[in-house]
Design a protein with these regions (language model features):
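Alpha-helical scaffold domains
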Residues: 1-164
Length: 164
């Protein structure tokens, strides 16, 4: 088990909250934080199937949920900034920023479900990594469910031949 100094992690998450409205600065700070906790000496089993084929940091499994918890209230309080930040994080070549983008979108208020739906459709129209797809469908769907648009969103995806 990896020891994580929760006091230091909370300070690092506070730095992320301070630059939440500046997506490029946030992305750099996030990469610095993830790089700080990366386990360089850990090697997964050779035959283990990776969760994602994107580049990824080898992080302790409790780190990303702690970051998500630390940013939850900020995401809920600043929905416009959350959308802008998620769009920037989704362009990142690493898996963890994309997973964080999906989580942040899931914290949007229900009145942003139309914007979320359009954003998800745009992202799903592109080739997508299975791990990132799983993160999208598990972490970002809450606003659609709250607005009772989840079923219609899925039916639209299934019936639209252009998105296949």
């Amino acid at each position: 088990m990896v020891a994580i100094d929760l006091t230091k992690l909370e300070q690092q998450i506070k730095q992320l909250r301070e630059c939440y409205t500046e997506p490029e600065r946030f992305s750099k700070a996030l990469h610095a934080l993830l790089g700080f906790y990366q386990r360089y000496s850990y090697r997964p089993h050779r035959r283990a199937m990776p969760a994602t084929f994107l580049r990824s940091y080898n992080l302790p499994q409790q780190l990303l949920p702690q970051i998500e918890i630390g940013l939850r209230k900020t995401a809920q309080a600043h929905p416009e900034e959350t959308i802008a930040l998620a769009q920037t994080l989704w362009q990142d070549p690493y898996f963890e920023p994309r997973a964080l983008a999906a989580y942040l979108l899931g914290k949007l208020p229900a009145q942003y479900s139309d914007q979320l739906s359009a954003l998800l459709r745009a992202w799903l129209a592109q080739p997508i990594d299975p791990g990132a797809l799983d993160a999208l469908f598990t972490k970002s769907i809450a606003p659609l469910q709250q607005a009772n648009q989840w079923k219609s969103f899925i039916l639209e995806l299934l019936n639209n031949p252009e998105d296949r």
